[in-house]
Structure formats: C-alpha cells, structure tokens
C-alpha cells in the first residue's frame, strides 16, 4: 500500500491512469489516435522517446480491444469528443495501471456517446485483472451497474461513503443535497435523482 503524503509520488504515477479534460488540452492535436494512446506508455503528452513498431502495435491493439479500431490512423483533432475520450481511456490503460481515475469523463458528450462511453467503462471493469476505476461525476444517472461503491463529497468533505445500495437512498441523498429527492429507476441498474422542490 501507499499512504498519501508519504513517499515518492513519481513512482506512484506509474500505477495510476488518468482521463481528464486537463490532459486532453495538452495532447498534440496533429497526432493519430494510436500515437495519442502510445503517449500513455511514457506518461507524457508527447512522444519524446523512440518507439518501434511493437509499441505502436500495442497502442493499436488497445484501441481495438476497446472496440475503437476504426480510430487507427485518424488525426486526434478530427475525432469527436466521445472518440477522444475513448482514446484517453485506451491511453490510460497502456501501462496496465492499478487504478484509473475518470474525471468528468462524459462532459461534452451527446446522449449516445455518453452511453457508449459508460458501456466501455463497464467493459473495462469486467476484464480479468481489471484496474480499480474511480469515476468522478455529477449526474447520478451515470452511475452504472458495475460501480458498486459511492463516495459523496460536498465542498471537499465526505458526506457519505459505502456500498451503492446503502448510499443511494432518499434519506442519504436528501442529507447530501440538503433537499428532498426522489430516486427514479431508469432500468434495473440505473436511476435518475429528481429534486423535490
């Protein structure tokens, strides 16, 4: 284990993959999707190290494994927001991390791209030796079946945490939102939180 604040954070970086708009803004838009994915192998936004056909093939294979083989050869700047997010997820998986942090991963996506991305995230969590996925979001309807623990934060402080079924209750959510809410099922595993005004 690692205690936050103790030790060298450089070594810790090798165990964490991050998907964030902060990273998107720093990636070279002229590179192809597979080269963007390859930057994850080096934890860099540019390919400053020499790489060979083997490494590039790994990046292509990663895209293909996420059902995004059609992005190979396409320039990053020409991809839709959803396609860019898939590239970032593939990029975050390049070094087989222990943890993936997905920070507001669906911001800017249309309804269909959002659902496709959420399915990809569930697919990743189902893989053998899957990394722990830390999914940061505001819309509760993005919480999928595979997301089994919830941490509710308000102004940087923990309000509630625990198994999803213990946290997603009208009482806990009313305390969190400081207003009454109604939980409306979308399907067997997803829900929408409606504010009762």
Report the location of each language-model feature.
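Conserved ABC ATPase "signature" region
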Residues: 38, 53-71
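H-loop/switch region of ABC-family ATPase nucleotide-binding domains
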Residues: 137-138
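ABC ATPase NBD Q-loop/coupling interface
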Residues: 1-11
């Amino acid at each position: 284990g690692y205690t936050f604040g103790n030790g060298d954070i450089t070594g810790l970086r090798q165990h964490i993959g991050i998907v964030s708009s902060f990273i998107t803004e720093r990636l070279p838009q002229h590179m192809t999707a597979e080269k963007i994915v390859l930057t994850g192998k080096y934890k860099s936004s540019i390919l400053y190290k020499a790489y060979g056909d083997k490494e590039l093939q790994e990046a292509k294979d990663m895209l293909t494994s996420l059902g995004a083989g059609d992005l190979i050869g396409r320039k990053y700047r020409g991809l839709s927001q959803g396609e860019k997010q898939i590239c970032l997820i593939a990029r975050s998986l390049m070094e087989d991390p222990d943890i993936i942090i997905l920070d507001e991963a669906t911001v800017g996506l249309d309804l269909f791209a959002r659902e496709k991305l959420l399915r990809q995230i569930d697919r990743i969590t189902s893989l053998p030796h899957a990394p722990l996925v830390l999914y940061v979001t505001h819309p509760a309807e993005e919480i999928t079946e595979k997301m089994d623990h919830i941490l509710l934060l308000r102004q940087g402080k923990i309000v509630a945490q625990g198994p999803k079924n213990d946290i997603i209750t009208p009482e806990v959510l009313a305390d969190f939102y400081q207003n009454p809410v109604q939980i409306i099922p979308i399907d067997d595993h997803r829900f929408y939180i409606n504010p009762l005004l």
